């Protein structure tokens, strides 16, 4: 029994000395110093990783800033060219024929006016009085063969009479033809014009109240397909004096003084 007590006492003394030494060591060495001494390579790699990550973010920010600056400069340059083109048209220094030399206009009698009044080159105008989508379908091969830089379509007003059942068939047919053109002309800018509103005196006819809904549907179609939409509504409503006697078609000056410069300004077509 005495031996056991003596052994137990010795063990307590040993444990006490060990604990004091351990506590002293812990006080003299911080946790960070301990970790640094134990894992120097890991800490070094982590520091390099953090530095490279920061450098990467700085490079990305600089590249993004550079791209944004280039975009702004490009837009400013384009805006000045558009302004210069509009000024040259107004002053007679350049012709509409030259500006739209690489643009093909396709559509109904409202497009036909460009040829009737001899405003643009007839070889880039494909139009027909009272044209419907069948006209566009019949001329797809011809349009593709021209391979224009820009293609502007205007259809719809002649289908208002036959649209009692809603917009479904109208958009389905139009969409199918535009998709076909986009596939066959991958490098051509395709611009779909909304239907021109009619003179307010004619607008009382029931069929013409459908124009705004049709234009909204055409605009939505353009977004879904990935082509451009041209909304001339505000322009036309401000040009009442340019309507013909029927309140639907326009005078020559509407095209030369209003609509074509409007396209230059809003779509950046400068030749």
Task: Please give the residue ranges for each predicted region.
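N-terminal secretory targeting modules
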Residues: 1-100, 116, 270-271
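Catalytic His-Asp segment of secreted/periplasmic serine-dependent ester chemistry enzymes
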Residues: 18, 22, 198-271
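Conserved SGNH/GDSL esterase-like catalytic core that processes O-acyl groups on lipids
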Residues: 87-173
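Second-shell loop/turn segments in exported
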Residues: 127-129, 159-168, 181, 203-208, ...
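Conserved, well-ordered alpha-helix/loop/beta-strand core segments that scaffold catalytic motifs
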Residues: 152-156, 179, 191
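Charged helix-capping and loop-helix junction motifs
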Residues: 167-177, 208-214
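Hydrophobic positions in alpha-helices of CheY-like receiver
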Residues: 177-181, 222
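A short helix->loop->beta-strand "cap" motif at the edges of active sites that frequently abuts
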Residues: 185-189
């Amino acid at each position: 029994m005495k031996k056991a007590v003596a052994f137990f006492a010795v063990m307590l003394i040993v444990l006490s000395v060990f604990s004091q030494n351990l506590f002293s060591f812990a006080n003299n060495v911080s946790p960070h110093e301990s970790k640094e001494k134990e894992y120097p390579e890991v800490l070094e790699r982590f520091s390099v990783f953090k530095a490279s990550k920061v450098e990467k973010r700085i490079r990305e920010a600089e590249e993004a800033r550079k791209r944004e600056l280039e975009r702004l400069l490009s837009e400013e340059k384009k805006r000045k060219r558009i302004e210069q083109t509009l000024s040259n048209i107004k002053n007679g220094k350049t012709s509409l024929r030259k500006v739209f030399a690489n643009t093909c206009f396709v559509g109904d009698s409202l497009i036909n006016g460009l040829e009737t009044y001899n405003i643009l080159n007839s070889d880039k105008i494909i139009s027909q009085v009272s044209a419907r989508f069948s006209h566009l379908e019949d001329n797809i091969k011809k349009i593709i063969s021209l391979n224009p830089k820009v293609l502007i379509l205007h259809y719809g007003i002649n289908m208002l009479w036959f649209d009692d059942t809603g917009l479904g068939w109208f958009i389905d047919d139009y969409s199918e033809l535009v998709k076909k053109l986009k596939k066959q002309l991958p490098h051509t800018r395709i611009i779909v014009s909304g239907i021109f509103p009619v003179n307010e005196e004619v607008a009382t006819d029931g069929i013409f109240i459908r124009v705004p809904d049709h234009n909204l549907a055409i605009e939505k179609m353009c977004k879904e397909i990935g082509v451009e939409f041209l909304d001339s509504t505000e322009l036309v409503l401000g040009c009442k004096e340019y309507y013909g006697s029927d309140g639907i078609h326009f005078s020559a000056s509407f095209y030369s003084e209003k609509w074509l410069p409007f396209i230059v300004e809003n779509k950046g077509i400068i030749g």
